[in-house]
Amino acid sequence: MRAYVITIGNEILKGRTINTNAAHIGRVLTYAGYDVIRMVVVPDEIDEIVWAFRDGLSRADLIVSTGGLGPTFDDKTVEALAKALNLELELNQEAFSMVKSKYDRLGVELTKERIKMAYMPKGAKPLPNPVGTAPGVYIEYAGKRILTLPGVPAEMEAILDEALPQLRVPGRYYYEESVVVRGIMESALAPVVNEVMRLNAGLVYVKSHPKGIEIDKPVVEVEVSASGSSEEEVRGRVKEAIRQLVSRAKSINPQCC
């Protein structure tokens, strides 16, 4: 199963806000059994957001967006989603109740800007926001699933956590483990990584992440990961690949790891 992540917001493109949401969503979806095939960032513009949703629908089974669900003029995600799916944008009564109850508790007026957060594509299901006010949106379309989340990290994480059980890919497990290799330059370790990949072709993925200075104080974290239908199986594959890697690295520098 493939997943596609969309981050919406001018502040991301300007570099004013670091895109931690995409990293969190990608991590969660990977452990939920998905292959995250693409992450895109688009501005707060209807046509750009429509393009992103349609591109995601053409490539993946699950599309997750973050950002653009609030009450301001530049929060355009649900409008763009409705347009992308050729669906009517309507006031969702369940979402309206969620939004109204939040503001009733605060004792503030339910303005048109606040009611805006209850509009959704026809047939969408609102997802409660335990942290903020804007509900998440879940909809199934043409055999694909779409989840839109707020841009505020705490709100995004809370709604995603609640939605995760219904999103998880059944019978699909992911496991990864890392080993830190010291005193071997990444360029010298590269043949070892290549050899371990060759020995485990199609079974594991091995990726080196340099943490030190290549020439002076080389430190390389090597990540080994695998996916499969059995948790025990993928764990075993990863551990065997790490054993192979450490054995070969020690032939270069016995004190490396």
Curated annotation (Swiss-Prot):
Record-linked Pfam families: MoCF_biosynth
Family (UniProt): Belongs to the CinA family.
Listed name of the protein: Protein Cmaq_1209
